[in-house]
C-alpha cells in the first residue's frame, strides 16, 4: 500500500486541487473505496479546506488499509475483532494512545460515510453513548440535545478527569446569547486566547495592542505584563489575539467605555480607571457577576458553560491547531506558554481532550469564529 498526493495537474471541472491524497496497492492499482472517501473529504465536503487536513486523513486510511493488505483482508468484510487487532498492533509498534484514537476516528468516519452511501450494510464496530466530561475516545457524533456522543467501543482510555470544553458550534450558540456586547468580548478572550476569568475581569486597557497598521487576518501579540495587569502567579506572558477581536475591543474602548468610565468616576470619586471592562453601572466586574452571567446564558442557550470551560476549549482546539504546524511537543509547549501553565504536565490534559475532536473540526475554526465577530460589528449599541 502506498499513499500519493495529487499535483497541480489534477482538475475537477476546471478547478485545480493540489494535495488530494489517494491510495494504491502493491500492484499500483487504485484502491477505490478509500479514494472515493478522500475525494469527498478533500473536494466535496466544504468544512475540510486545508490540504494538511486532507493528508492527515490520507495517512490514517493508509495505516488501516496497509494493515488490511498485509493480512489479506477486504475492507467490507471485517469485524470488530479485526479492528481490535489493528488497534493493538499500533500499540505494539509504540504509537501513543492519542494517535491510535485519532486513526480509529478517521477510519470510523470512513465506514460511516460508506454506510451512508450504500457501499456497506453495517458498521464493523459497536458504539456507546458517553458524556464529553468523561474520559472517552474520539468524537463521532454530537447529540443535538446536549453533550452526549456516540463513541467507538474500541477507543482507548487516555486520561481521567478530562477538561470540560465545548465544540465550536456549541460555543457559538452559547456566546451568541451573552449580552451586552461587553460580555461577549470577555467570552471571546477566554475562547480565542485562553485567558482566565480573573485575567479578563481585571484586564488593564494599556496592554491592548493597537490594530492600526496591522494586516487583517493576522493575530496581534498582547503582552500580559504582570506589572500592569493581574495574572496568575504574577507571571508575564503573551497571547495571540485575532485581528478581528482586537478591532472589536478597540471599538468597545472608543465607543462604549468612555460612558462607563464617567459612571465609575461619579460613583467612586476617583480618577479614571485603567480597567478595560466595566459593568453598565460603571463598576468593576466581579467574578460572581461573571459566573451569574454565564449561568443565565447557559439556561437561555441550552448549552451549559462556565468561564473556565471556554479556556479549556481554547486549550483543546489550540493544541490540535498547532499540531498541524509543529511537533506534538512543540504544540504542547506553545499551548503551555499561551495559557501560562507552570508545567507541561498541566497542559498534557489537552492532548487527551483532543481525542474527542476530529481533524475537520479544527480546519478553519478560528476564521469561522472571526466571521461571527464581524457580524457583531455594531455590538456596542446592544
Indicate where each model-derived feature is located.
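Flexible interdomain linker/hinge and immediately adjacent N-terminus
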Residues: 122-168
